[in-house]
Amino acid sequence: MTIRKIYQIAFFIAFLLPGKSNGQISQGGIPIQINKQKSASFTTDLVVMPAIDNLKMRDKYSRTDQNMLKQFHFAHSFDVSLSPNNSGKWYNTSEVNVWQIRIRSTGAYSLNLILHKFRLPDGARLFLIGSNTGEIKGAYTSANNSDSQVLAIEPVSGDELLVQYEEPVGVSFRGEFLIAKVAHDFVGITGDGVHRPLGISGSCNKNVNCDLANGDESIRDAVCRIIIEGTEICSGSMINNTALDGIPYILTASHCIGSEIQAESSVFLFNYEMPYCSPNNPSTDGDIKRSLSGSSLKALFDSINFALVRLNNIPPYNYRPYLIGWNRINTAPAYSSCIHHPLGDIKKVSIDWLPAQTGTFSSGYQPNGFWKILKWDIGVTEPGSSGGPLFDQNKQLVGALTGGSATCNLPTNDYFLKFALAWDYRKETGKQLKAWLDPLNSGASKLTGMYLYSGKMLCKPVTNFKDNDTHAAIQITNGLTKKGYYSGSNLVGFTEFAEQYKFSKNCEVQGVSLGIAKVKTNPLNASSLIGVQVYSGVNQPETLLYTEKFVINRFYNDAMNYISFQTPV
């Protein structure tokens, strides 16, 4: 078999190929910098939320979460009503009108917003910018318009953010949106920077890409982290149906998404994981850019604790969307595994090598309606794991997490809803899975999974890291003199760095994830670019296949940063 070897020039914080950026870039664009002396309308652009005591809020939810359900409360939501018609400031030019408002909730680790009545014309752009970090979310455009007119946005680090709306002169209609909720993070879901602090979930948890999870690559790609109404975190998974038509259904727990408004106000984050195991060096976070906002509720039944929603948008091909296969036969799996996001952390895997038992979760729930894990052999589940899929020995879904008492100190007694019972225990289409996952009425008891873009010959993720490898920013030294970094800014003339990846068959490379230690640049300066090149070759880079430049200030420190090529290679 021919081996195709792809070489890519890695990112360097040496500002490879510096230059000016023009127009739209692949990471979503750069907000316009405006002359603030051209302001009009309102007298203030700062709105401050009522004070919150983070410690008291954490204590409150740690007590309310003692019912064994495993959603993760991390934020308090304020109801507001802020729009370009009643708040903020407008800045007008001959080509574009720009509206800004600043929102502060003192002491928040991060802020997130939920927008209602969201309807933008073509050409308009909306950004959220962290006032302290320069983190940029957006641009949100007419592509984010939906029937629900709801847009939920991932958290922005820090206790103050700037909302900036840009509308070209002469658009077909005036854009509309209402900031309806501001959520104050009292836990630290993004830590002190823009990313979640690692090591917060239990130390017994294992990264999903450790060698012990070999063979789980496909089902791993189906699992997502869900932020519901800006305040809670759960897990969920994309699931296949017998029509094989690629409808993006997500299965989770009903105590996570329990209503249509919660479905509409949810954010689904895919591929939030480490690309390697890193058991002894958990200092690099996963990529947080591949998310989708909004869904519609299709089916729910509380006493079995399942919810099925349909995403408003089909995940793009570079999300690697996989639709999990399932087994609805009510037979205990010989052994079980669960992939989930404990405490909102990067994706983890838990394994029980013994057969699951039938059990009852608690009063108010269907008797004997759950798979009981007596004891985890590897990892556990935690708050934030609710809704995470349970797989049998054939990697088919047989349940989803409701809750339990398992901890790293005592990894016992977790409960997963039975997929077999959720299938058609109730006959109403809004309270069963059968109507949605077997639209052909085929009577199938099992279904295999599939990648949503199976015909595109996409390359599978590859890495050169092994389980026990570590990483560090290595300085170049000459005696006592420090001359910079091997893969960053330096005084010895290193301007490029190559890494070799091997693929067993011809396939499309869609992008690359880069571990960035630190970036220093003006958050709104669009002039600093860095280049990525893809080569083919045998023992060294030989034939240039692709090159693209990226704006440096869109990268996150101490984290994996996924960049998508505008044209797959």
Regions found by a protein language model. Give the residues of each.
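C-terminal subregion of chymotrypsin/trypsin-like serine protease catalytic domains
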Residues: 250, 278-291, 298-300, 308, ...
